[in-house]
Every structure is written in C-alpha cells, then in structure tokens.
Amino acid sequence: MSTVDDILEHIGEFHLFQKQTFFLLALLSGAFTPIYVGIVFLGFTPDHHCWSPGAAKLSQRCGWSQAEELNYTVPGLGPSDEASFLSQCMRYEVDWNQSTLDCVDPLSSLAADRNQLPLGPCEHGWVYNTPGSSIVTEFNLVCAHSWMLDLFQSVVNVGFFIGAMMIGYLADRFGRKFCLLVTILINAISGALMAISPNYAWMLVFRFLQGLVSKAGWLIGYILITEFVGLGYRRMVGICYQIAFTVGLLILAGVAYVIPNWRWLQFAVTLPNFCFLLYFWCIPESPRWLISQNKIVKAMKIIKHIAKKNGKSVPVSLQNLTPDEDAGKKLNPSFLDLVRTPQIRKHTLILMYNWFTSSVLYQGLIMHMGLAGDNIYLDFFYSALVEFPAAFIIILTIDRVGRRYPWAVSNMVAGAACLASVFIPDDLQWLKITIACLGRMGITMAYEMVCLVNAELYPTYIRNLGVLVCSSMCDIGGIITPFLVYRLTDIWMEFPLVVFAVVGLVAGALVLLLPETKGKALPETIEDAENMQRPRKKKEKRIYLQVKQADRPLS
C-alpha cells in the first residue's frame, strides 16, 4: 500500500498547488503578529504628567511655553526612577488660583524649597506627550492603574494557552480546515469588536477571545502546509512560514507608524482576517488527516485534485490507500496519547520545556535590553531584522547536519551569551550589545527549530494536538516573563541573565535526547513515532505491544 509521501513524489512535492497554498497560509502567519506583539503599539505609554485645571489656566494667563509649564508645575523632573514617578503620577497640592502666584517661578511664593510642598496623586487625569493615542492614553492605564496594561497582555496569553488545548483537540478530531476557518471567523469578529470597545472591560473580553483562537489558527496553518508538501520540502516551508511572521513584524511597524490611533490601527490589522474566510474555497482538507480517520475516498479525491493542479496524474499502482480489513474504526486523539508510550512521553516533556525556554528567553532578552527608546517604530523594525540571519543560518545547516545539533547549539549559544553578559563591564557597552544580539539570534533559531521539529515527532492523528499542547508552554512563559525580569532586577540587575543562562543551557542538553528527523517520513502511527529513535541495541528494536491494532500504518 502507498503513503502520502509516496504519492507526492509522483504528483509533486512542492509544485503549483503547494506554492499557492503556502502563499495563502503565509499571509495568515504574517497577520498573527499584531496579536502576538501588537501591545508595543496598542499599549504604548508616552511621557505624561498630571493635568491640573488651575495650573492650565495660570499657564494660559502667563503665556508659558510647554517647557516652562512643566518646570513650574510638575514635581520631581529628573533622570532617576523616583523623579520619573513623581513627575508622572504626583502633583503639587496647591491652589493654583491664588492671586499671589507670579508668572515667574510661582511656587517660590509658597515655599523656599518646592520639595517641601505637599504632593498628592493625580485627580483630574493626565496630559500625554504624544500626537496619537493608545489604550494607555484613552483609558489612563498609568500609575496606580498601570497593572491593567499588564493584564491586557496577560489575558491574551491565557487565551493562547486555553485555545491551544481546546482547538488543538478539535482540529485532530474534526479536521484542520474546519477549525482553521472557525478560528479565522472568531478572530476577525472579536478583533473588530475590540476596536469599538466602549470601555476597558469589554476590550479585555475581546482581547481574550482573540487569544483563544489566533495562535491556534496560526499553528493549524503550520500543520496544514507541513502535511501538504513532500518530505524534501517540509523544513523549507516550515522555516519560510515563520519568516512570514517576521515579515509581518516589519509591516506592523510601518502600519503603526502611518496609523498612530490605536482604534484605527486595530481595524487595519483585523481586516485581513475577513479576507481569509475565502480560504473555504481555496484550501482543501489535509489528506493525511483524512487517511488517519479512514476517510480514504475523500483523501484520494483531494490527492487527485492536487495532482491535477500540478499537471500530474496519480499512478494506478499508488491509488490503493485502503486500510487493512481489521484496521478498525477511525482514531480519536486523546491527551493521554501524548504520554502513554515511552518515546512519545519523552518527546512531549522535552518539547514542552523547550517551548517554555524559547518564550522566556526570547521575550526576556528583549525586555532586559530595553530596546524601546525614543523611536519605538525604528527600534521595533531593527529588532525584527535580527530574526532574518537566524532563519538563514537554519536553512544553511539543517539539511547538512540535521535538526538536532543546530537546535541544541542555538539554545546553548543563547544561554552562554546570557552568562557572558553578566561578566562584561558596563563601560564595554558595544560588547554587551554584540553579545546580546548573539543571544537574541540564538534563541530565535531555537524558537523556529522547536516549531519545525515538534510537528515531525508525532503521528498524524495526534500531530496537531501534540504541537498545540506543547506550544502552550510558551504561553505560560509569556505570562511569567515580565515578573521574572522585573522582580529579579530589583535584587540584582544581571540576575535574570543568570536564570536565562541556566534555562537555555539545560534546554540545549535536553534536545540531544531527541531523535534526528532529517530525511525521515512523517510518522503515521504511534508505532512509527516510537521507533524514530536511532537504533542502539538489538533489544531496543521492538514495536510496542500496547499499541492497538487500529494504530497500524496503512502501508
């Protein structure tokens, strides 16, 4: 009997059909970036200070410039963190309507030292030094309410986590295409509703709904294109699918620069999702999934459609996809399948840890470097460019030395770079930046590798579930990373880097325990996945008897 990989060798492993499908799914990948990192622009926090009606009237009467108004009426102006808090969150508790106040240094008539004047929290709102708007400026998510911005980002990661578990199961149970279209529809509607949210609470609800479906949709797209192409092109489309995400980062920076209003920006980045609903007529169901569910007739119909699109025909000798008579009923994925057998259990635990590590180091290094500066658009753009060399290195090495060693080395390089940064003195700033970029490049490679290899280690009927469950650990990492960075820096500025170093080095060592997937067909059954490990001893070359008869391969 034939496998899908056998048939693709004859009808085209990456011909017209696969190229068109990849292009459509790459658009989906790029459109995910505003949800994953859009907080940089949607939640931008500009310089701000308390607004006082009395001080504003006095400024107008005296004809002060903006600099003079800030100097005369805002406490604690200075470079220190304490001074920044005072200037942004506190005000002088004085009556600005007093007739004794002069236009030149008005507070001098009340106290010889203005530091002796009583201070209080802002009562009438804030003045924001920005021409645009963000959720911070509209809902005043600053000072005592700054935690609400953290919650805004945390809730989308909670959505990522729940959605990965829920939709991953549904995609393996009811099909990739159905779940992909459902996630696109919900993402489009919730994104549009978020743009017109009347208050913070409703905005939070729609943000959660976006998180619930958006990441799962991105990963389903990854699984789909991986299952449509032949063995020789899996790694290429996997890497290019993630490069499309990086291209989305660059486009997002440009769109955010052109549209500085957060509501219109949210509309702009949501609109493509409505266009993606047309994929109902453009992208078929995965024939690999159909075969795993014993829907052989439908699978062969799609395979013939692919062959026709590629200008090929399916050889008669390869059209026998009928399972054995005793193959039993179609397989239903279960969470227990991810840990039931020894090798798959090992794969699951190592992959979960590496997803967690990639998220913590990727986001943590960005936070620790403090990339956001005077121009967030350029900073964001330049930081995205770092990801292209990482993808280029993977393309150069992955077919020459395999997946496992580049993946392990990239984790170790990231960890070693973090450790080296601890011992570099501050006066060698150029060296610290260079090492930091090296670490960012290493963890970017690791992030791309874990996504690529994850899909190659699971059998077809639990592949989508395995990818989404394991990748949910990066959502846990995304939730705790801000606390990890900011709490540990209170103890010692370099403390987070020490933690990152240990986590990264351990991740690299664990990768070496995984089997090499270079040049191997995607496992179709649990038996295939259990026997992926390189043979060592004769007694280890066995098929696990606990695998059910229904799990036999079709060929």
From Swiss-Prot:
Keyword Zinc-finger applies: no
GO cellular component, one term: apical plasma membrane
Catalytic activity: (R)-noradrenaline(out) = (R)-noradrenaline(in); (R)-adrenaline(out) = (R)-adrenaline(in); serotonin(out) = serotonin(in); dopamine(out) = dopamine(in)
Domain of life: Eukaryota
Residues with glycosylation annotation: N71
Transmembrane residue ranges: 22-42, 151-171, 178-198, 211-231, 239-259, 264-284, 349-369, 376-396, 405-425, 433-453, 465-485, 495-515
Keywords on record: Cell membrane, Glycoprotein, Ion transport, Membrane, Transmembrane, Transmembrane helix, Transport
GO molecular-function terms, A-Z: acetylcholine transmembrane transporter activity; amine transmembrane transporter activity; choline transmembrane transporter activity; efflux transmembrane transporter activity; L-amino acid transmembrane transporter activity; L-arginine transmembrane transporter activity; monoamine transmembrane transporter activity; neurotransmitter transmembrane transporter activity
Tissue specificity remark: Expressed in the kidney, in the proximal tubules of cortex and of the outer medulla. In brain, highly expressed predominantly in regions located at the brain-cerebrospinal fluid border, in the leptomeninges, in the choroid plexus and in a layer boarding the third ventricle. In brain, also observed in the granular cell layer of the cerebellum and in the granular layer and pyramidal cells of the hippocampus in the CA1-CA3 regions. Expressed in tracheal and bronchial ciliated epithelium in the respiratory tract. Expression is greater in the kidney of male than of female.
Topology relative to the membrane: Multi-pass membrane protein
Reported impact of C451M: Transport activity strongly reduced
Site feature: Involved in recognition of organic cations and participates in structural changes that occur during translocation of organic cations: C451
Family: Belongs to the major facilitator (TC 2.A.1) superfamily. Organic cation transporter (TC 2.A.1.19) family.
Task of the protein: Electrogenic voltage-dependent transporter that mediates the transport of a variety of organic cations such as endogenous bioactive amines, cationic drugs and xenobiotics. Functions as a Na(+)-independent, bidirectional uniporter. Cation cellular uptake or release is driven by the electrochemical potential, i.e. membrane potential and concentration gradient. However, may also engage electroneutral cation exchange when saturating concentrations of cation substrates are reached.
Misc note: Mediates the renal secretion of many clinically used cationic drugs. Transports drugs such as diabetes treatment medicine metformin and neurotoxins 1-methyl-4-phenylpyridinium (MPP(+)), famotidine, ranitidine, amantadine, acriflavine, amiloride, memantine, cimetidine, cisplatin, oxaliplatin, platinum-based drugs cisplatin and oxaliplatin, 3'-azido-3'-deoxythymidine (AZT) and tetraethylammonium (TEA). Mediates the bidirectional transport of MPP(+). Metformin competitively inhibits OCT1-mediated thiamine uptake, leading to a decrease in hepatic steatosis.
Name by which UniProt lists this protein: Solute carrier family 22 member 2
